[in-house]
């Protein structure tokens, strides 16, 4: 499966980015929390549009328990400088209430995903990082939603939700305290 190469591996930090909501944050800042990173683009992307309500729901439901959802806007079809207002408009259209950064040059997308997963079929992907900073679950792209357009999207949502619940129940361990 695309994404297996990153499972069980430390997540590299995403570097310096402009934050349009929340932030600035680094993975080091979030140690001790479960982090769901979603790479997304404009509402024209059907996968991004289809997954946005799920991100909002997971943030609403599990945020108080220690889940931090982080949106990483990646311009398409290729890296380009993106006006903050444009990204803010997308964030508003999606209804995001969690931290969102602009990854103009795709450096975070490359560090966390593309450089580590040579067979990646999607850029609209999600990584679930545990309290110690280890990638523990990957949604390699497309949509995950409880009321998704197909059986796979619904299964992927349930798998993400179950992984979040499992990681929230784990302790961070002595190295992170």
Predicted regions and their residues:
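Loop/turn elements at helix/coil->beta-strand transitions in domains of secreted/extracellular proteins
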Residues: 31-35, 64-68, 95-99, 131
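N-terminal "domain-start" segment that seeds a small globular fold
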Residues: 1-28, 50
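Structural microenvironment flanking redox-active thiols in thiol-disulfide oxidoreductases
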Residues: 49-94, 105-111
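Thiol-/selenol-based redox modules, centered on thioredoxin-like
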Residues: 122-177
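Short active-site neighborhood of thiol/selenol oxidoreductases, capturing the structured segment around
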Residues: 25-49, 55, 69
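Solvent-exposed loop/turn segments at secondary-structure junctions
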Residues: 42-45, 75-78, 105-108, 135, ...
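Structural micro-motif
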Residues: 95-99, 114-127
């Amino acid at each position: 499966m695309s994404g297996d190469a990153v499972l069980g591996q430390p997540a590299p930090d995403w570097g310096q980015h402009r934050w349009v909501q929340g932030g600035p944050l680094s993975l080091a800042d979030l140690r001790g929390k479960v982090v769901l990173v979603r790479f997304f683009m404009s509402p024209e992307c059907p996968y991004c549009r289809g997954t946005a309500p799920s991100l909002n729901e997971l943030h609403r439901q599990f945020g108080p328990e220690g889940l931090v959802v982080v949106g990483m806007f990646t311009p398409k079809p290729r890296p380009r400088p993106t006006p903050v207002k444009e990204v803010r408009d997308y964030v508003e259209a999606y209804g995001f209430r969690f931290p969102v950064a602009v990854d103009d040059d795709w450096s975070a997308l490359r560090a966390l995903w593309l450089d580590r997963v040579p067979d990646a079929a999607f850029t609209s992907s999600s990584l679930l990082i545990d309290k110690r900073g280890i990638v523990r679950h990957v949604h390699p792209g497309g949509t995950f939603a409880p009321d998704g357009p197909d059986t796979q999207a619904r299964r992927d949502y349930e798998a993400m939700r179950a992984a979040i619940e499992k990681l929230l129940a784990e302790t961070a361990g002595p190295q992170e305290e």
